[in-house]
Each structure stands twice: as structure tokens, then as C-alpha cells.
């Protein structure tokens, strides 16, 4: 997977997409608002990923139905991100206004996760919530990439605040959301989403950056490489199916307490934080074949390790690999989506990356693992995820071929 990248091609990734004549001033208030948004949004995710399955189990669902509900939540990420991107590209829609609208509706839906359980009602609310919740993140990431270019601040150092929020929510959730306290889950979630809506009011207005001006500052595109990159993103996210859907239940079954499970999640995200803070720009400049290939290899080792052992020391070491399987992979992928996509399709390209990876990949992975867990057990699900990560590693070879053609 070695790469030979001409310096002028390599520098295209950081060639400004925004002409200096229309570059707006980004205030400290806007930067603080973006950090607060990421913190609250991912704090909500830090509750949903580890504890929503536990909440559903407490309501009486078996593991198969937990997989259906979590898969339905992930499935909304297939439609919402590209649809939101297309709306912003084809209509004169203000990003900040659209983000406020979607954040407000996601908050309203989360308040309807009421304890009185009715399967049809609950599934409908989960789908509505997931749709608006999924539309928010790729738009915010796109906005943050623009802001990072304008303000010369690393995207990773904006995005890292989401990891901080995830850490606190995962750890505190493990302490609070135990036993009967799991009924507090929907109310804590709603509070965090209210904070995301408040933070979105402080986002900068970038409406003066229009499509033609972006086109004039465009880099050469590579659509075939983009398609392979999207498939690789699908494989990586699908390989997380057992982890995001059933890791907490797996650890409960192995005898760990809620606090210990929360700590396991925290260890993974702490590794993610360190990588994002210190190596964000270096990773984004490196060849995608090298970075994504190494990340997929380490992901396969991570899932294989979880399949064969629940030893506490091994779990701690394996959780450190989250820095590769999520953080390094994400930083590289969003940067190369930006390089390979058509300049006037930047927003929808990020939406498609989110849709195919976090949406379709997560849906397939979680629902497949739900079936495997119900019939074969937790270890078998992690073996399956190992295979999926290795499949993505094979696809990196095709990406490298197209990357060399472009270079």
C-alpha cells in the first residue's frame, strides 16, 4: 500500500476552498458554540451507545429486538445525512437555521421516550428521533471543516470536544444509570439535546460562501476513489456492529459492573482524544491507503481480541485501539472525502460518507450481530466483525490503485 504522492497533488487537500475575498470572520463566541455543540451532542451519544440497549432490555426486549431497535436508529442515518446535504446545495437554505430546526425536533422526540412501554410507539419515536439526530452531525462536521480553514484551527481540536463529552457521559452514566435509575435515561438525553440546540444558535453565518466561488477554488476530483472510500467506510462501521450494539451487554454477561463498563468506554475515547489533539493534521496529510489500511488491520485485531477473551487487562489494551478504529480513520476519511468530491458537492459528499458508513454500515453490522448474538453468542458476533474489517482492508488496495492514477 505504499504511496508515491506528488507534492503538488498532496497539497491539494489543504488548498483553500474558500476565496479570501469572501472569507468571513469567525468569532471566539462561534468557536465556543461549536465546542459546546460537539460536547453536548456526543455526551448524548455517550449515553445512547452504551446504555440505550440496557434501557431497552430493562423495558423487556430480548437481544433480537434490541438489535432491531438499535438497527432502526442506525438506519435513519442512511437517509437523513445525504438528504440534508442535497437540500442545502439545491436550495437557498441557511445551515445554521437548518441545524436549529433539526436539533429542536430531535430534542422534542427524545422527550417522548416515556417509560410506559408500547413497542410500536417506541419504535416510531426512535425512528423520528434518529432521523433528525442523524441529520445534524455531518452538517456540523462540514461547517467545522470550513471554520477550521478560515480560523486556521485544526478540525481535530474542534471535534475532540465531542470525545470529551462522550467520556463524561459514558463514565457518569455507568455510575448513575444502574438498577432502577436506568429510567432516567430519556430525561438526561433530552437535557443534553436542549444544550445542542442552544449551542447551534451561536454557529457562524456562512451563507455568503456560494457554490460558484467554491468551484473557482476547487481541487481535481477522483470519483472512483471516492466510491471506494465510501465502501471502506461502510466496512469499518459495519465491523463496529458488535461493539456499538452489544459490548455493554457482553460485559454485563461477563460479570462486570456498570461503573467498570463505563470505564471501558472511557478508556477507548481517551485514546481517541489524545490522537485527535496531537496528530490530527499529520493523519489528514498522509496517504489514505496507509492510514485507512493500518486502521482496518488494527480494528480486526481489536474485534478478534474481544471475541477470544473478557480478561480485564486485555480489554483495556484492546480499547486503546479505538484511537485507530475510530479517530484516525475518521480524520483521514473526512479529509479525503473533501479532496475526492466535486467542489460543489462537498456538503452532500460528507452526507453520503455519513450515510453509507455510519448509517448503512452501522445498520447492517448491528442487525447482523443481533441475529448472531441471539443464535450463537457474543464471541461469534465479534468474530464476524473481524472478518468485515479484513474485507475493508482488501478494498484499500483498490483505493490505492485509483489514488495512484490520480497522482
Kindly give the residue locations of the regions a language model identified.
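Helix-loop boundary and gating motifs at the non-cytosolic
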Residues: 26-74, 226-264, 330
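Hydrophobic core of transmembrane alpha-helices in multi-pass small-molecule transporters
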Residues: 39, 109, 119-137, 234, ...
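Symmetry-related core transmembrane helices of the 12-TM Major Facilitator Superfamily/SLC fold
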Residues: 184-202, 381-398
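Cytoplasmic helix-loop-helix junction between adjacent transmembrane helices
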Residues: 127-161
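Structural signature of the two symmetry-related core transmembrane helices
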Residues: 97-111, 290-305
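Juxtamembrane intracellular "pre-TM" segments in multi-pass secondary transporters
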Residues: 22-28, 203-237
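Interfacial helix-cap and linker-helix signal at transmembrane-aqueous boundaries
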Residues: 56-57, 87-88, 160, 175-180, ...
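Helix-to-loop junctions at the C-terminal end of transmembrane segments
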Residues: 80-93, 177-178, 274-287, 373
Amino acid at each position: 500500500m505504499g504511496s508515491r504522492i506528488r507534492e503538488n497533488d498532496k497539497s491539494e487537500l489543504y488548498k483553500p476552498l474558500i476565496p479570501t475575498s469572501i472569507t468571513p470572520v469567525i468569532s471566539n463566541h462561534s468557536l465556543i458554540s461549536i465546542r459546546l455543540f460537539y460536547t453536548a451532542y456526543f455526551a448524548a451519544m455517550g449515553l445512547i451507545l452504551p446504555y440505550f440497549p440496557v434501557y431497552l432490555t430493562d423495558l423487556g426486549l430480548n437481544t433480537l429486538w434490541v438489535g432491531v431497535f438499535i438497527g432502526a436508529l442506525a438506519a435513519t442515518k442512511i437517509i437523513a445525512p445525504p438528504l440534508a446535504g442535497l437540500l442545502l446545495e439545491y436550495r437557498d437554505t441557511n445551515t445554521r437555521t437548518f441545524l436549529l430546526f433539526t436539533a429542536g425536533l430531535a430534542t422534542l422526540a427524545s422527550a417522548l421516550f416515556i417509560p410506559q412501554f408500547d413497542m410500536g410507539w417506541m419504535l416510531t419515536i426512535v425512528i423520528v428521533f434518529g432521523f433528525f439526530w442523524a441529520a445534524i452531525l455531518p452538517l456540523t462536521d462540514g461547517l467545522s471543516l470550513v471554520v477550521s480553514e478560515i480560523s486556521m484551527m485544526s478540525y481535530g481540536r474542534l471535534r475532540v470536544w465531542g470525545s470529551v463529552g462522550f467520556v463524561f457521559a459514558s463514565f457518569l452514566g455507568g455510575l448513575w444509570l444502574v438498577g432502577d435509575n436506568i429510567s432516567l435515561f430519556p430525561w438526561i438525553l433530552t437535557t443534553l439535546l436542549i444544550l445542542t440546540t442552544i449551542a447551534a444558535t451561536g454557529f457562524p453565518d456562512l451563507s455568503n460562501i456560494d457554490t460558484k466561488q467554491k468551484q473557482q477554488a476547487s481541487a481535481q476530483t477522483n470519483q472512483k476513489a471516492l466510491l471506494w472510500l465510501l465502501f471502506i467506510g461502510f466496512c469499518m462501521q459495519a465491523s463496529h456492529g458488535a461493539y456499538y450494539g452489544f459490548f455493554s451487554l457482553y460485559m454485563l454477561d461477563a460479570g462486570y459492573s456498570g461503573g467498570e463498563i463505563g470505564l471501558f468506554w472511557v478508556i477507548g475515547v481517551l485514546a481517541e482524544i489524545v490522537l485527535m489533539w496531537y496528530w490530527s493534521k499529520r493523519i489528514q496529510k498522509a496517504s489514505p491507503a496507509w492510514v485507512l489500511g493500518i486502521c482496518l488491520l488494527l480494528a480486526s485485531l481489536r474485534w478478534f481480541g474481544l471475541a477470544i477473551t473478557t480478561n480485564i487487562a486485555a480489554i483495556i489494551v484492546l480499547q486503546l485501539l479505538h484511537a485507530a478504529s475510530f479517530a484516525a480513520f475518521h480524520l483521514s476519511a473526512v479529509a479525503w472525502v473533501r479532496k475526492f468530491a466535486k467542489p460543489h458537492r462537498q456538503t452532500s459528499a460528507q452526507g453520503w460518507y455519513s450515510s453509507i458508513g455510519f448509517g448503512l454500515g452501522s445498520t447492517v453490522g448491528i442487525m447482523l450481530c443481533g441475529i448472531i448474538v441471539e443464535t450463537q453468542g457474543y464471541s461469534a458476533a465479534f468474530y464476524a466483525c473481524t472478518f468485515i474489517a479484513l474485507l475493508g482492508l482488501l478494498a484499500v488496495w483498490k483505493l490505492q490503485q485509483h489514488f495512484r492514477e490520480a497522482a
